[in-house]
Amino acid sequence: TTPDDHFNTFVVYAGVTRDVAPAVYLQLPESYTSNQVLIKLLDKALEGLPNQPTFTEMMQNGITLGQLRQLLKTKEIVDVLEKIGIDTGALGQLIKVIDKLPAVGDNLRIAVGVPNRAGAYSVTAITDNKNYNVGVGVGALVLKADKAKLVWKQDIGKKISAANAKTADFAAELQMNGTAVSDQSSVHVLYSGLTSKWKVYSSTTTPPTEPGRYVMTAVVLGGNYQAAPITRSFQITK
């Protein structure tokens, strides 16, 4: 190769997030995503095809493997790519790489871009240049969860009246550098204890309001953040 050689690189990230959910990402070359002329040509070629999103919609919402296969079989699309010097052979190799992933079917949704969720991924890079054979390289990527901190949203003290318990905010929230993170879906709270009538109380959704003694624990399960659990005990009085 020479310093003047230009290669487009497609990257496939496939793996499992911290939520144990499968995830596949396709990173397109900048020559695709920043070329407004190319995007308009591809959008126009795709507009007339049934059940096929435009290229702009694919970049925003992702694409299923079935749609990607159909895309590469469409003559109008292949013609557009070849006219501007894009090696469609590399795109065929891209399909082969994705086909080798476990449990792959046409309904597999592929996100366009790079992984944005903590997890472990295999990485396959595919380069293209019409003057060279298609190159394929394989590696691995681990995205670690950001370290955050769990805090109680309201200090209820050691004792709280039954009347105040009905309006108190028992929730916990994740914070980074003192600011609540936007996604709180991984925060879970367990309430347990005994009412004053010796009735066992346990819930993961509803805080207690009857007089008694209770313990509550907040934990983070999955998601893009990790934080140590927090626990507090309190008494609800009449």
Where are these regions (language model features)?
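Solvent-exposed beta-strand/loop surfaces, strongest in extracytoplasmic domains of secreted
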Residues: T1-K238
